[in-house]
Amino acid sequence: NPETRYAGTPHNVGYEVVERLALSWGLSWDMTPEALIARGSAEGKNVCLVKIQTAMNLTGSGLKHLSESMAFSPEQCILVFDDLDLPISAVKTRIKGGAGGHRGVASVLEAFQTDAIRRVKVGVGKAGGKLDRVTYVLTAFDEESRIAIDQSILTAKAHLLDMMGRPSVAKTH
């Protein structure tokens, strides 16, 4: 979600991973009507990082439109997103499959009519106590969780590099 009120919440972990990649690679963001885009060369490859500027649940239509104007296929994409079903700090990759209940991923799979889209899932844990799922993903991380998420983001970056075909410096799971 592009709005600043989502910064630092479980809902925007994917954005954080992509932002940190852009920063570590020295890429800057350009704004288009659909997305913020950072292009350049990194790790010996041409890369294009995308932050769709729509609500998470509408990511698919924005990414599909962008794929048509920029001529890329879903097989060239790697989605990065939060996963409530993974414990906080866990990171997993998939090369294809269903949405697993994630509305943003469902939107992308529906827009492209394929499940063959690679993904990096960053665990944000489950809502605890009296919080419902929606409130939880829209509430900023507490200090302990923030530390775990920061480590997860580093792990997610390593997994992204692996998926791009570059051996990772640290093989983590």
Feature map (PLM): residue ranges:
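Conserved TIR/SEFIR loop-to-helix hotspot centered on a Trp-containing motif
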Residues: 99
